[in-house]
């Protein structure tokens, strides 16, 4: 065996003995580095005659290729072994039982929404739906709010660039009453409907949010009175709070879409809120102008309407003091209701 063949055999042995990439690089330097044995052999060619240099160069190149092939093979083997070890370390025992999936829950405001629909549905009220982007006429004008009404200002209402197909300004609805207008213009009396949904106003503090939920109710017929309104709402709050031990009072107030108008307060007969009058709703007899805008003759039909904030009802039902808790997504808070 000539010296170059012995060199190849020795290189293959050294590469095979390398147990990691660092050891392999050290072995490579011994043969193929700047001062490696193959490199020194290549440098010695300059001392040979041209014909001998050509022949010896071919032999050295052949030896170099064999050494490089052995190096590549060992490098691949080490890489594969490292990958296999990592996969074995990360292996999953497929015989282990699976992890149970966490179940979600209904948001407390949505629970109140569902509860309101159940209560009013049980006494014959339909549920209306409608767009959250409304036009100026349906949100304000149809409800007897003139163009100079302060609620139309940019400080209270989120306006949207552009107009609808009829050239009316667009905005995010400030209450769910527009759904009642749309429902009434598409149906004939008797009308009994509630309109729950999201609403938007420029407001944000511990008791107000720029986005909040309302439920409004409307009853239009020929022979109803304010006494019917009182009876319906009294039965509703007793069912919602699941107690007969409460009082309800109506205070005179003003709303452009009802006349007469009232604020509705309740007082619990027991619990931490015992004896305190708490505002829960605005209500009243539908204004004649609003009835006309709905397409009804106020001389023939009469109606009453009411509206409550779902967050407000939920806060009273569960004893929550800060409205912002509903929107922070804190699971420690939300899990208490599921």
From Swiss-Prot:
<comment type="similarity">
    <text>Belongs to the class-II aminoacyl-tRNA synthetase family. Phe-tRNA synthetase alpha subunit type 1 subfamily.</text>
</comment>
<dbReference type="Pfam" id="PF01409">
    <property type="entry name" value="tRNA-synt_2d"/>
</dbReference>
<dbReference type="Pfam" id="PF02912">
    <property type="entry name" value="Phe_tRNA-synt_N"/>
</dbReference>
<dbReference type="GO" id="GO:0000049">
    <property type="term" value="F:tRNA binding"/>
</dbReference>
<dbReference type="GO" id="GO:0000287">
    <property type="term" value="F:magnesium ion binding"/>
</dbReference>
<dbReference type="InterPro" id="IPR010978">
    <property type="entry name" value="tRNA-bd_arm"/>
</dbReference>
<dbReference type="InterPro" id="IPR004188">
    <property type="entry name" value="Phe-tRNA_ligase_II_N"/>
</dbReference>
<comment type="subunit">
    <text>Tetramer of two alpha and two beta subunits.</text>
</comment>
<dbReference type="GO" id="GO:0004826">
    <property type="term" value="F:phenylalanine-tRNA ligase activity"/>
</dbReference>
<keyword id="KW-0479">Metal-binding</keyword>
<dbReference type="InterPro" id="IPR002319">
    <property type="entry name" value="Phenylalanyl-tRNA_Synthase"/>
</dbReference>
<feature type="binding site">
    <location>
        <position position="259"/>
    </location>
    <ligand>
        <name>Mg(2+)</name>
    </ligand>
</feature>
<keyword id="KW-0963">Cytoplasm</keyword>
<keyword id="KW-0030">Aminoacyl-tRNA synthetase</keyword>
<keyword id="KW-0436">Ligase</keyword>
<dbReference type="InterPro" id="IPR006195">
    <property type="entry name" value="aa-tRNA-synth_II"/>
</dbReference>
<dbReference type="InterPro" id="IPR045864">
    <property type="entry name" value="aa-tRNA-synth_II/BPL/LPL"/>
</dbReference>
<dbReference type="InterPro" id="IPR022911">
    <property type="entry name" value="Phe_tRNA_ligase_alpha1_bac"/>
</dbReference>
<keyword id="KW-0547">Nucleotide-binding</keyword>
<keyword id="KW-0460">Magnesium</keyword>
<keyword id="KW-0648">Protein biosynthesis</keyword>
<protein>
    <recommendedName>
        <fullName>Phenylalanine--tRNA ligase alpha subunit</fullName>
        <ecNumber>6.1.1.20</ecNumber>
    </recommendedName>
</protein>
<dbReference type="GO" id="GO:0006432">
    <property type="term" value="P:phenylalanyl-tRNA aminoacylation"/>
</dbReference>
<keyword id="KW-0067">ATP-binding</keyword>
<dbReference type="GO" id="GO:0005737">
    <property type="term" value="C:cytoplasm"/>
</dbReference>
<dbReference type="GO" id="GO:0005524">
    <property type="term" value="F:ATP binding"/>
</dbReference>
<dbReference type="InterPro" id="IPR004529">
    <property type="entry name" value="Phe-tRNA-synth_IIc_asu"/>
</dbReference>
